[in-house]
Amino acid sequence: MTAELAIYEKFIDAGIPHYCGADSFALNGAFCGYGVDYAKLGVETADMVIEVLQGADPATTPIKTFDNGIVTVNTETAEALGIDYSGFAEKCTSVVETVTAEEFE
């Protein structure tokens, strides 16, 4: 993600919100990262596995999709761009706030 550290300020200077597909980009300066709610995905996957182990036919197991996920917003970048991101809350499982870091756990 070090590449993000090299470009995020250029997006801010240009007034462009940079949207990404992973939270790690927001941790490195992008406006926000949007991705799958892996906890919810894990629960749904486990439920499907239980059904199959109890005799359900995998060929007839319905496909499940998710209509929301987790958005990680870099609050420093949002402030620099003057963006109110409160509208994300009603469309996502959760909104995680972060600030720019060169390293993260």
Can you describe what each PLM-predicted range is?
Residues 1-105:
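Short hydrophobic alpha-helices and adjacent helix-cap/hinge residues
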